[in-house]
Swiss-Prot record:
Compositionally skewed regions (Basic and acidic residues) per UniProt: 313-324
Organism whose genome encodes this protein: Neosartorya fischeri (strain ATCC 1020 / DSM 3700 / CBS 544.65 / FGSC A1164 / JCM 1740 / NRRL 181 / WB 181)
Name under which the protein is recorded: Actin cytoskeleton-regulatory complex protein end3
GO molecular function, one term: calcium ion binding
Region (Disordered) residue spans: 306-327
Name of the encoding gene: end3
Length: 404
């Protein structure tokens, strides 16, 4: 199984883009998403395939989970993690809430897995008769714990989801598949809860040394479709009710009880609990991130060209470098310096330092100069008024002197 996943920091960045494009709506249409997807400079054919993969529910729009899938596919293509758009969506990219849609789509394109029916022509020696369809309350509780720990979003169980249980049992693979075929006559990809409980009940008895029944009662088979299996003890025939004791020890006395080891490993059946985990989209890329990605892509292309040039120049390294050919080492160095310069500019813009800070200081200085200029004009006006008053006083003094 792949260890890849969409990290939380990616989800947060994708949310910033999604929320800015969606304007409060829960989905993006193709026009809204095109503005950011086309910045990747992928071809329209590639972007069309990415859209078709990400639009899991096929409604022609992308909700946030589907948008995260599309963005991750685009970044993997740009960064060279993917050489081409995959034909089907990788399992690790499938949103947990839409897994059933992907499974249904695959079921329509592929035939469901059907196991060969194993007919027990000669009974396995050492097995006992007396299989009882009645489920004791303690057994039923254990079956329900196993079911709850492995069910999908539709409340169904697939054959592969119980592989850990099969490994803990003393039951041959052929018998396990025979039991599955018995409770799954339609050869579906998954079975519902009632069929699962019956399947686990058969495995329990086989684990305890009882033969697997060859048929299922008609009423019980019908109840798999109606979800109404009758577990009432009063409805069971006395001969069947006491046909076997589910609490008896196993023949070896050392074999673990059915499902105990498996439930212990899952952390259920006691104080623990088990909850399947997938990518959590409940919790959020800026345009400059595309520039970083493009620069890294150009750098990788330059690196590839450099490697090709080095291979072509093997045996001629001592030749003087005056033939006009490009200096790939210098080109790589300049590309790295350009990347560092762009990242430093982005950092200064975010932090308000460097040239961004100098620009802010210059603006403040201009504002101060404007303020001082206004104050000077005010002082000049005040000085002119005082000069007029002084001239008037001098005129009055001269008139007094003339009178005397």
């Amino acid at each position: 199984m792949s260890n890849k996943k969409i990290e939380q920091w990616e989800i947060e960045r994708y949310w910033e883009i999604f929320s800015s494009l969606a304007n409060g709506h829960p989905r993006l249409n193709s026009s809204q998403a095109a503005s950011v997807l086309r910045n990747s400079r992928l071809s329209d054919d590639q972007l069309e395939k990415v859209w078709d993969l990400a639009d899991v529910d096929g409604d022609g729009e992308l909700d946030f989970e589907e948008f995260c899938v599309a963005m991750r596919l685009v970044f993997d293509l740009v960064n060279g993690e993917l050489q081409a758009v995959p034909r089907v969506l990788p399992d690790w990219l499938v949103p947990e809430t839409k897994a059933h849609l992907v499974q249904a789509g695959r079921a329509l394109s592929d035939r469901p897995e059907q196991f060969e029916r194993i007919e027990d022509e000669d009974d396995t020696p050492g097995l006992k008769d007396g299989f009882d369809w009645y489920m004791k309350p303690s057994d039923k509780s254990k079956y329900e714990e196993i079911y709850s720990a492995n069910r999908n979003h539709r409340g169904e169980i697939t054959f592969e989801s119980l592989q850990g249980l099969y490994d803990s049992l003393d039951v041959p693979d052929t018998d396990i598949r025979s039991a599955w075929n018995l409770v799954n006559p339609s050869a579906s990809l998954a079975i519902n809860k009632d069929a699962t409980l019956a399947f686990l009940h058969i495995l329990n008895y086989r684990h305890e040394g009882f033969r697997i029944p060859r048929t299922i009662p008609a009423s019980l088979r019908a109840s798999f479709e109606n979800n109404k299996i009758d577990y009432q003890i009063d409805n069971a025939r006395p001969a069947q009710r006491w046909g076997a004791d589910g609490d008896r020890e196993t023949p070896t006395g050392r074999k673990a009880k059915f499902g105990d080891t498996y439930l212990s490993r899952l952390g259920v059946g006691g104080k623990g609990s088990y909850t399947p985990k997938g990518t959590d989209f409940s919790d959020t890329i800026q345009d400059e991130e595309w520039e970083k990605v493009r620069l890294r892509r150009e750098l990788s292309e330059l690196q590839a060209k450099l490697d090709a040039a080095n291979k072509a120049s093997e045996g001629r390294r001592d030749r003087p470098r005056n033939d006009g050919r490009p200096n790939w080492t210098l080109i790589k160095k300049e590309a790295l310096q350009l990347l560092e310069y762009k990242e430093r500019e982005l950092r200064e813009l975010r932090e308000g330092t460097g040239r961004a800070k100098a620009g802010q200081d210059l603006e403040r200085l201009r504002e101060d100069i404007r303020t001082v200029g206004e104050q000077v004009e005010g002082l000049k006006s005040h000085l002119a008024q005082r000069k007029e008053v002084l001239a008037d006083l001098r005129s009055q003094i001269e008139e007094e002197r003339a009178r005397r």
